[in-house]
C-alpha cells in the first residue's frame, strides 16, 4: 500500500496499465470515496486531496502517474505516517482521545509503501449513512469508453467534460497501426505529455523559425510537446 498522503503543489492524474488497486481519497471537506481500479481506469486527485493506493490480489499493479506541474516535488508531498512520526505521543493521545501507549509501536519515520493483507471486497450495497461521498467521483473508466476508430488506429480521450473533477488534466489513449501516422497538429491551450507503453514510434516537434527536433521512442519513454508547438 502507498499510505495516506497529499500533494501541496500539484494535482495527480493516473492511468492503470495492469493489475488492480483500491483508492481511498479524502477531500478538504472531509468527504471520502473508496473505489477499486483496474486496467483502463483513470483517477484524478485535485491538489491537497489526501489519498492512499492499495494493491489488490496476487498480481502487481502498474499505473502511470502524471502531475499537472513541472515543479512537482516530494518536498511538497505530505505523508500521514511522517506527520505522526514527528508528533509527540502525548499530543497524539489528546488528538485521538486514546491512551499514550497506543502509539508506542508507531513508526519512527515515514513509511512510503507498506506490505499488508489483501483487503476484502467492497460491499455492493453499503449500509445506509455509512458513506459520505464527494459530489464528483475521482474515477473514470476510460477503458470502458468506446474509442474512435480511424484508418490508422484508435483514439480514446477523457476531458473535463467527461470527468468533471479533472479540472487541469485531459488524457488520451492512442493506438497506431504499424507505419500509421498521427497527422500534423498542435494544441493551442495545453502542453502535451506522452508515455509510450508498447511498440516504437518517431516524433518530430516543430517550434517555428525553422526549429525542429526528431526523436524515436519505445516502451517506458516519455515525450513532451510545449503548448502551441506542432
Give names to the regions the model predicted.
Residues 2-3, 22, 41-43, 47-52, ...:
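Histidine-centered metal-chelating micro-motifs
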Residues 7-29, 178-181, 186-209, 219:
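Glycine- and acidic-residue-biased ligand/ion/polar-headgroup-sensing regions
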Amino acid at each position: 500500500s502507498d499510505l495516506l498522503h497529499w500533494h501541496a503543489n500539484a494535482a495527480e492524474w493516473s492511468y492503470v496499465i495492469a493489475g488492480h488497486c483500491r483508492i481511498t481519497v479524502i477531500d478538504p471537506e472531509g468527504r471520502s470515496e473508496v473505489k477499486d481500479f483496474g486496467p483502463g481506469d483513470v483517477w484524478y486527485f485535485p491538489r491537497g486531496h489526501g489519498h492512499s493506493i492499495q494493491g489488490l490480489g496476487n498480481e502487481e499493479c502498474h499505473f502511470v502517474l502524471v502531475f499537472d506541474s513541472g515543479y512537482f516535488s516530494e518536498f511538497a508531498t505530505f505523508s500521514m505516517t511522517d506527520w505522526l512520526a514527528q508528533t509527540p505521543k502525548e499530543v497524539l493521545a489528546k488528538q485521538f482521545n486514546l491512551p499514550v501507549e497506543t502509539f508506542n509501536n508507531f513508526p519512527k519515520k515515514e513509511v512510503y509503501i507498506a506490505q499488508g493483507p489483501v483487503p476484502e471486497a467492497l460491499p455492493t450495497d453499503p449500509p445506509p449513512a455509512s458513506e459520505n461521498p464527494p459530489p464528483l467521483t475521482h474515477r473514470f473508466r476510460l477503458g470502458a469508453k468506446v474509442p474512435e476508430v480511424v484508418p490508422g488506429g484508435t483514439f480514446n480521450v477523457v476531458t473535463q467534460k467527461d470527468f468533471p473533477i479533472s479540472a487541469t488534466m485531459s488524457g488520451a489513449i492512442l493506438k497506431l497501426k504499424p507505419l500509421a501516422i498521427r497527422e500534423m497538429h498542435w494544441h493551442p491551450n495545453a502542453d502535451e505529455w506522452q508515455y509510450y507503453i508498447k511498440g516504437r514510434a518517431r516524433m518530430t516537434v516543430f517550434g517555428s523559425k525553422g526549429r525542429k527536433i526528431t526523436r524515436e521512442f519505445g516502451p517506458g519513454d516519455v515525450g513532451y510537446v510545449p503548448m502551441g508547438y506542432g
